[in-house]
Curated annotation (Swiss-Prot):
Penicillin-binding proteins (PBPs) function in the late steps of murein biosynthesis. PBP-2B is required for vegetative cell division and sporulation septation. Beta-lactams inactivate the PBPs by acylating an essential serine residue in the active site of these proteins, thereby interrupting normal cell wall synthesis. This protein itself, but not its transpeptidase activity, is required for cell division. It is a single-pass membrane protein. Induction: Transcribed at a low constant level in all growth phases. Part of the mraZ-rsmH-ftsL-pbpB operon. It comes from Bacillus subtilis (strain 168). This is Penicillin-binding protein 2B. Keywords: Antibiotic resistance, Carboxypeptidase, Cell cycle, Cell division, Cell membrane, Cell shape, Cell wall biogenesis/degradation, Hydrolase, Membrane, Peptidoglycan synthesis, Protease, Repeat, Sporulation, Transmembrane, Transmembrane helix. InterPro entries: Bact_Transpept/Beta-Lactamase, Beta-lactam/transpept-like, PASTA_dom, PBP_dimer, PBP_dimer_sf, PCN-bd_Tpept. It comes from the Bacteria. The lineage of its organism: Bacteria, Bacillati, Bacillota, Bacilli, Bacillales.
Length: 713
């Protein structure tokens, strides 16, 4: 018995010691925490604060891209995703249910707004899930649709806010502007191409946050001290692009692309006095809303090719500047041997017999320019002028992807060929920059597209571009002489530019027919050329300089190589000059009916009848949206520029009836849909030829209107 007690006492002692050690460890731990305020390396006060701190995002917007007059080219727009909560556990108060209670009623109500039948919606709501979405019909919900659904007060129906990049003009300088898209990893919009990518550091937004103290349920405490990190909206970028002039260019390119199906079209409109690019476009192009891209390059700056006879402008200018061009001196046209090889005139080397250099320019004689280079200027001086006109270097335009030229000036035949636009490859933008010297009295201007950048939060201009001279290769008197003879290229019966006459305005310019280099030589065939025209107007004091190039158009019998080029140049130049209110050299009856710029009157708060009358008095075409008696909204807004006979939209409220959109442009159709708050799907290019909803039929809330476009034959 005593032996047993001995072992029991020893066990009790060991157990007591263990408890004592455990007690002292706990006591020490508590003392450590009490003194240091830390546990497991973390400050407990901070940890406790974090558990009761919540963060709420203050969303910022990506900067907009605008034209020179502030019209939107690219902007963020809010969209919404429709979701339905099916989990009954989300409802904590039966008086305020947070899940879908009546699926039949919910399906019936939603079917009136989104493009899904009641049965399809009901199938989705009957799924075994806590939360469901509605596929493509529930994405990109407009604010107007969201408001309609919210007014229905459907339990369990909610929205997730989203943002997408929107390009209201569709195909519009797309290879210049580029596009931005959502990064799937960060869920942020980032530039992926063009100016959207290059200027991403300016356009990029930074969300802000509000940090606040909350209770256990997450609700903000009444006396919470909020910490605010302010959001930073992206900067707004204003371009030199003019929306109206760009539209003139886009519309004419679309017609030519449809009619002649060329491999490429490249065109730009520039103010030669400043170097501002007012319009720039190409075909093929794409709609940045759809991102149906086939060519990621901006061909005006990224495509170097043998320019053809437009290069003769600068050889002529060099010869005139050096006083070696004698207009009345005669030479033998047809063929001329250089470096052991024949230079041939474009009529198969037949020529026009002995002719003057003056007429050689008008006829675009290769022999005339080869002889000017070899016998009058000399190759060294010609090369000096190639340097003066900056053909050996990039222009430095503020766009990504500009490539270098390739001037072949080693062999004699290449030297002579460069004088008339073969052998050496240059970019369209290099030719345009050089031509500003001709249009701007000898002073060459560097082209640019970014005008200024504004911080919208501070309403402060953080970058301001300005015109920059790229040199003075010729004198003002030489520039005038060149313009005069280029004017004759257009007006003379022997001139190659007769197709580019514009009634009321004197045009100076030069045609180009460039051979396309292939494997082992130039491509054969009558269509395998790049046809172009470099033109300026008015001739005596040019306000606009336009370059157009059309590569490999499919010409039919009876069609001329100048047809596709002139069908872009002429309407773009004429409409732009009228839009800019440039006085015609000679006024004609037809000029009175041409496009004129004017100011949009304020038609809001007027009766429909009064607003329509006022619009018609201003030579505008009013389109009424709604059935109420008074105008509540209008597009364009008051004091914005409008053109003669332009459609203007007057929104009244009430029931909306479908208009006849036949002949409307894509832009007009999309503007109508945006103001009316209806969903319109467009397909094709050109002008509206059909619509899915008949004229005068009432447009229901969920109606999707499909409009097809086609270019006129």
């Amino acid at each position: 018995m005593p032996k047993k007690n001995k072992f029991m006492n020893r066990g009790a002692a060991i157990l007591s010691i263990c408890f004592a050690l455990f007690f002292f460890v706990i006591l020490g731990r508590m003392a450590y925490i009490q003194i240091t305020g830390k546990a497991n390396g973390e400050v407990l006060a901070t940890k406790a604060t974090e558990q009761h701190e919540k963060k709420r995002t203050i969303e910022a917007s990506r900067g907009s891209i605008l034209d020179r007059k502030g019209k939107v080219i690219a902007e963020d727009t809010a969209t919404y995703k429709l979701i339905a909560i099916l989990d009954k556990k989300m409802t904590t108060d039966v008086k305020h249910p947070q899940h879908v209670v009546n699926k039949e009623k919910t399906a019936e109500a939603l079917s009136k707004v989104i493009n899904l039948d009641k049965a399809d919606i009901l199938d989705i709501l009957n799924k075994d899930a806590k939360q469901v979405e509605f596929g493509s019909a529930g994405r990109d919900i407009t604010y107007s649709q969201k408001q309609k659904i919210e007014k229905m007060k459907l339990p369990g129906i909610s929205f997730l806010r989203d943002t997408k990049r929107y390009y209201p003009n569709g195909v519009f300088a797309s290879n210049l502007i580029g596009y931005a898209e959502v990064d799937e990893e960060t869920n942020e919009i980032s530039g992926a191409m063009g100016l959207e990518k290059v200027l991403d550091k300016y356009l990029k937004e930074r969300d802000g946050y509000v940090t606040y103290e909350s209770d256990k349920s997450g609700w903000e405490l009444p006396n919470s001290k909020n910490k605010i990190t302010a959001p930073k909206n992206g900067d707004n970028v204003y371009l030199t692009i003019d929306q109206k002039i760009q539209t003139f260019l886009e519309d004419s390119m679309t017609k030519v692309a449809q009619k002649y199906n060329p491999k490429k079209i490249m065109a730009a409109v520039v103010d030669p006095k400043t170097g501002k690019v007012l319009a720039m476009g190409q075909r093929p192009s794409f709609d940045p809303n759809k991102r149906d891209v086939t060519n990621y390059y901006n061909d005006l700056i990224s495509y170097a090719y043998e320019p053809g006879s437009t290069m003769k402008i600068f050889t002529l200018a060099a010869a005139m500047q050096e006083n070696v061009f004698n207009a009345n001196e005669k030479y033998k046209s047809g063929t001329f041997e250089v470096g052991g090889a024949p230079v041939k005139d474009h009529n198969n080397g037949v020529g026009w017999g002995p002719t003057t250099y003056h007429d050689g320019v008008l006829r675009s004689s290769n022999v005339a320019f080869a002889k000017l280079a070899k016998e009058k200027l000399g190759y060294d001086r010609l090369n000096q002028y190639l340097h003066k006109f900056n053909f050996y270097q990039k222009t430095g335009i503020d766009l990504p992807g500009e490539v270098s030229s390739k001037i072949n000036f080693k062999y004699e035949f290449d030297k002579a060929s460069t004088a008339y636009g073969q052998a050496s490859a240059v970019t369209p933008i290099q030719q345009i920059q050089a031509a500003t010297a001709i249009a701007n009295d000898g002073k060459m201007m560097k082209p640019y597209v970014i005008d200024h950048i504004v911080d919208p939060d501070k309403d402060k201009t953080i970058y301001q571009n300005k015109p920059e001279s790229a040199g003075t290769p010729i004198s003002a008197s030489t520039a005038k002489k060149v313009r005069d003879i280029l004017g004759e290229v257009v007006t003379s019966k022997i001139g190659t530019g007769q197709a580019y006459k514009i009634e009321g305005f004197d045009v100076a310019g030069k045609t180009g027919t460039a051979q396309i280099a292939g494997k082992g030589g130039y491509l054969d065939g009558t269509d395998n050329y790049i046809f172009s025209f470099m033109g300026m107007a008015p001739k005596d004091d040019p306000e606009l300089l336009i370059y157009v190039a059309v590569q490999q158009p499919q010409l039919k019998a009876g069609q001329s190589s100048s047809d596709p080029v002139s069908e872009i140049f002429n309407p773009t130049m004429k409409n732009s000059l009228h839009y800019l209110n440039i006085e015609p050299t000679e006024k004609s009856d037809s000029d009175k009916e041409e496009t004129k710029a004017q100011t949009m009157p304020d038609l809001t708060d007027q009766t429909v009848a009064a607003a329509q009358k006022k619009a018609k008095e201003e030579n505008l075409t009013p389109i009424v949206i709604g059935s109420d008696v008074a105008v509540k909204e209008q597009y364009p807004k008051a004091d914005e520029e409008v053109l003669t006979n332009q459609k203007v939209f007057l929104k009244t409220g009430g029931k909306i009836k479908m208009p006849d959109m036949t002949g409307w442009s894509r832009r007009e159709v999309l503007q109508y849909g945006e103001l009316a708050g209806i969903h319109i799907e467009v397909s094709g290019q050109g002008y509206a030829v059909s619509q899915s909803v008949k004229k005068d039929k009432e447009i229901k809330d969920k109606t999707v209107i499909k409009v097809k476009f086609k270019n006129p034959d």
